[in-house]
């Protein structure tokens, strides 16, 4: 039997990274034992889209969510039977129940369930309601880190900036030209219907 003799010692700063590298390579080779090199590369690839994107299936098209949209200004978005868009503080108001339909990836249309009107924004940034859905009814939905959503017109911009759906402190719609993504008037929390 041969006795092992340590002939060279790695400097301490290099010892740990080398040890971890050996362990990592050994683990990968064990885990990928029966895979081809191509399969191994795709399973270990850290830049694959699945690793870095969140899974929001409803943003991919065709999905319908029924929600109340609660603004950070303490108003629920409402579309009444005459097509008037404004806020209400009554949680149980039937006109504040919305269908949020995914039109394309990140693009939604918002429809009042009771009124059957679609939320729309014109070129001037004014919110209004339409019976028929068209390009004015498409909004880019963005989920913020604070768990609120913003909805910007997918068709219209003002001086290169996005125009957002927003309700002021009195529950009245704010013109899209005067809105920014950071403003709490443009932040809505989609609340599940209970």
From Swiss-Prot:
Keywords tagged on the record: Glycoprotein, Growth factor, Heparin-binding, Mitogen, Signal
Family membership: Belongs to the heparin-binding growth factors family.
One GO MF term: chemoattractant activity
Subunit structure: Interacts with FGFBP1. Interacts with FGFR2. Affinity between fibroblast growth factors (FGFs) and their receptors is increased by heparan sulfate glycosaminoglycans that function as coreceptors.
Annotated source species: Rattus norvegicus (Rat)
One term under GO cellular component: extracellular region
Glycosylation sites: 45, 149
Gene name per UniProt: Fgf7
GO BP terms, alphabetized: actin cytoskeleton organization; branching involved in salivary gland morphogenesis; endothelial cell proliferation; epithelial cell proliferation; fibroblast growth factor receptor signaling pathway; hair follicle morphogenesis; lung development; mesenchymal cell proliferation
Pfam families hit by this protein: FGF
Residues of the signal peptide: 1-31
Record-linked PROSITE patterns: HBGF_FGF
Protein name: Fibroblast growth factor 7
Superkingdom field: Eukaryota
Functional note: Growth factor active on keratinocytes. Possible major paracrine effector of normal epithelial cell proliferation.
């Amino acid at each position: 039997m041969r006795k092992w003799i340590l002939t060279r010692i790695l400097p301490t700063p290099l010892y740990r990274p080398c040890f971890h590298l050996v362990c990592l390579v050994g683990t990968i080779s064990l885990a990928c034992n029966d895979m081809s090199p191509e399969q191994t590369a795709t399973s270990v690839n850290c830049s694959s889209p699945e690793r870095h994107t969140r899974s929001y299936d409803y943003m991919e098209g065709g999905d319908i969510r029924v929600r109340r949209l609660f603004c950070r200004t303490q108003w629920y978005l409402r579309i009444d039977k005459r097509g008037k868009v404004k806020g209400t503080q009554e949680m149980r108001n039937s006109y504040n129940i919305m269908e949020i339909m995914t039109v394309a990836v990140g693009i939604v249309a918002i429809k009042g369930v009771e009124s059957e009107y679609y939320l729309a924004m014109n070129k001037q940034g004014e919110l209004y309601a339409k019976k028929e859905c068209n390009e004015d009814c498409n909004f880019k939905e963005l989920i913020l880190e604070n768990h609120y959503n913003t909805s910007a017109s997918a068709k219209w911009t003002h001086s290169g900036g996005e125009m957002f759906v927003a309700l002021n402190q009195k529950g009245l719609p704010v013109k899209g030209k005067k809105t920014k993504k950071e403003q709490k008037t443009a932040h809505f929390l989609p609340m599940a219907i209970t």
